[in-house]
């Protein structure tokens, strides 16, 4: 997977004509076979849950990963609701927040952290204010989704544990984290 596979395929394509010529010169193929196979087309299918490859709507694996994230959120929500908890879900995606963003929309998350959109410096205050307002309006649970590559505007990582600490320290709200990792 990744750039190594694409680089190898490109190199193989570049060497194809010399390989065919060598086979012809050593008598392993005929002139007709060499002419018939003088050009090589390579087709690749991108397999990446991150959905971070240009030129494709959705990479293989993205839909399955998103399904797993939503499934986990669906399993967490009843517990969060009954215990009036906040849950911080950390999802994969390296430097691509696609999974976090779409999962945030589908699960109606209160806050989403994605690498492409580092939050403003006062994000902890805005997060806490949002959660307070939601609770004051009668909401019994909160969902916050953090992409694994999320950073602030200074390039510092934003992690599920870091977000949990802010919520617990500032709001004294019962908060749990779930890092999905490779189960998605």
Swiss-Prot record:
Subunit structure: Homotetramer.
Entry-linked PANTHER family: ATP-DEPENDENT 6-PHOSPHOFRUCTOKINASE (PTHR13697:SF4), PHOSPHOFRUCTOKINASE (PTHR13697)
Main subcellular location of this protein, as a coarse class: cytoplasm
Protein name, per record: ATP-dependent 6-phosphofructokinase
GO MF assignments: 6-phosphofructokinase activity; AMP binding; ATP binding; fructose-6-phosphate binding; identical protein binding; metal ion binding; monosaccharide binding
Gene transcribed to yield this protein: PFK
Record's signal peptide: none
Cofactor: Mg(2+)
Organism per entry: Calanus finmarchicus
Highest taxon in the source lineage: Eukaryota
